[in-house]
Amino acid sequence: MQPRKIVILGSTGSIGTQAIDVVDAAPHRFEVVALSAGGGNLALIAQQAVHTRAQAVGIAQGDQGALRQLIAAAAAAAGVRNFAPEIFVGPDASTRIAAIECDVVLNGITGSIGLAPTLAALGTGATLALANKESLIVGGALVKAAASPGQIVPVDSEHSAIAQCLRSGTDQEVEKLILTASGGPFRGRSREQLHDVTPQEALAHPTWDMGLMVTTNSASLVNKGLEVIEAHLLFDVPLDRIDVVVHPQSVVHSMVQFVDGSIIAQASPPDMRLPIALGLGWPDRVPRAAQACDWTQATSWTFEPLDTVAFPAVDLAKDAAKQGSTFPAVFNAANEEAVEAFHAGRIRFTQIVDTVESVLSEHSGSSELTVESVLDAEKWARARTLDRLATSAL
C-alpha cells in the first residue's frame, strides 16, 4: 500500500504540529508533500520542511531568501543533502499549496482566511481534512457546492466524534446531534462574575492547548456556537436538532441520538492526534493513534446543561445560521475583532459577544452568496465592530 500524500496547511500551529506527529508515527501510511504557514515562525517551518522532506513550502509573509537559508541550515544540521523545496510567499501561498496534487489536504489554518485554501483543495478532488471550521461556516453553501459527497472529513474532535457515531445508523434514523463542551475556564460563573475576568484567565483552558483565538472562543462559548453551525452544514441536520451539553471531563466528544431513543457516544482521552489521524486516514482508523481510556482507573463523567444566560454565544450563532447568507461570516469576523480588543485591554470579556450581537443586528445580508460577498461582509463587519469598540467603555 502506497502512503497517502498529505498537504498540511497551518503546519506551525497546534493542529499542524500534531499532524506531523501523526505522520511520524505512521510513515508507512502517510507522506507529507507540502507545508504552509503564516510565516511567524520561519525557523520551525524550515525544520518541518527538512524533517518531512516536503516538496513545497508556503508562507503568507516573510522573506523567501531568509526561509531558504534556514532550510539550508536545517538540512545541513540534519545531514540532508540536495534538498531545495519550491517556496511560495504571499497572501495566496496557502491557496497555491492547497492546489498541489495529493491525496489529503489538512486545513489547520485559523480563521476565515482559510476559505480560499479550502475551495482550492476541494477543486483538486483531494480529501479535505477540515480543522479550519471558519471556512465552512463563512463559505456555507459555496463550500458545500464545491465538495463532492464525503470529500470533507471533519477534524474538530466533536465533529469527528459525530462522524464516527453516524456509522451506527442511517440518516433517517438520526433524531439529534449532541455536541459536548468542556464549559471552559469560566464554567459555573454567572454573567455578573464574568465582567472582570482577565485575558490571562480566558486563556487558561482546563483541557485543550490551543492558540489565542480558539482558546478565547472556547472561554466565551463562541467556539461551540461555530461548531453548531459546522455540524449543521456538515451533516445536514436542522439547527433545532443540534444540542449542546456541558461535559467538563472532555472524554465524551459528542453523541448522536437515534429515533429509537438510543444514544451512541464517542469517548477517548482528550488528544487531537486521534481526530487528526482519522481525518488523514478516513475511513480507516490508524492503530494506536492515541491512548485509549484506562478503565482500571476510577473516573466519573458528568454532564450539565449549558447556561445560555451567562454564555449566549451558542444561541446567537444558531440565529446567525438560521438567517444564512453572510450572517455567519459577520458573526465570525465581528468576534475576531472583539477578541483582539479584549486581549488589548479595550473591552470587557462580556462585551465580546455583546458586540457581535450588536453588529449582527445591523447586518442586512447579501442577495447572493459568493466569495466576493463573503469578503465584503467580513470587511463591513470588521469596520463596524471597530467603530463600535471605539465608543465602548470598560
UniProtKB/Swiss-Prot annotation:
This protein's record includes keyword Metal-binding: yes
Domain of life: Bacteria
Enzyme class: oxidoreductase
One Pfam family matching this protein: DXPR_C
Any one GO molecular function term: manganese ion binding
Binding site residues for 1-deoxy-D-xylulose 5-phosphate: K133, S157, E158, S182, H205, S218, N223, K224, E227
Matching InterPro entries: DXP_reductoisomerase, DXP_reductoisomerase_C, DXP_reductoisomerase_N, DXPR_C, DXPR_C_sf, NAD(P)-bd_dom_sf
Keywords: Isoprene biosynthesis, Manganese, Metal-binding, NADP, Oxidoreductase
GO BP annotation list: isopentenyl diphosphate biosynthetic process, methylerythritol 4-phosphate pathway involved in terpenoid biosynthetic process
Reaction it catalyzes: 2-C-methyl-D-erythritol 4-phosphate + NADP(+) = 1-deoxy-D-xylulose 5-phosphate + NADPH + H(+)
Residues the entry annotates as binding NADPH: T12, G13, S14, I15, G38, N41, N132, E134, G211
Cofactors (names): Mg(2+); Mn(2+)
Keyword Manganese (UniProt): yes
EC number from the UniProt entry: 1.1.1.267
HAMAP family: DXP_reductoisom
Similarity annotation: Belongs to the DXR family.
Name this protein carries in UniProt: 1-deoxy-D-xylulose 5-phosphate reductoisomerase
Organism of provenance: Paenarthrobacter aurescens (strain TC1)
